UniProtKB/Swiss-Prot annotation:
Protein role: Carrier of the growing fatty acid chain in fatty acid biosynthesis.
Annotated protein name in UniProt: Acyl carrier protein
Pathway: Lipid metabolism; fatty acid biosynthesis
Source organism (scientific name): Polynucleobacter necessarius subsp. necessarius (strain STIR1)
Domain Carrier, residue spans: 2-77
UniProt PTM comment: 4'-phosphopantetheine is transferred from CoA to a specific serine of apo-ACP by AcpS. This modification is essential for activity because fatty acids are bound in thioester linkage to the sulfhydryl of the prosthetic group.
């Protein structure tokens, strides 16, 4: 597991109150991890803070799984 993946999973665990061990890359924030719309907004804000990036609303709506969050963070970290 690379550093970005670990950081994303740590944020997800903290924001949603779930154990890191229960978080899989394919986990859906809403369907698998029990997030509601406010949770997902707070999650996006935490990711923005952690990685020093801005996630536009139209992009944030597409980030529905842990893997999509990892992929987005990686794309911004490299770009």
């Amino acid at each position: 597991m690379d550093n970005i993946e670990q950081r994303v999973k740590k944020i997800v665990a903290e924001q949603l109150g779930v154990a890191e061990g229960d978080i899989k890359n394919e986990s859906s924030f809403v369907n698998d991890l029990g997030a509601d719309s406010l949770d997902t907004i707070e999650l996006v804000m935490a990711l923005e803070d952690e990685f020093g990036i801005e996630i536009p609303d139209e992009e944030a709506e597409k980030i529905t799984t842990v893997q999509l969050a990892i992929d987005f963070a990686k794309s911004k970290a490299q770009g």
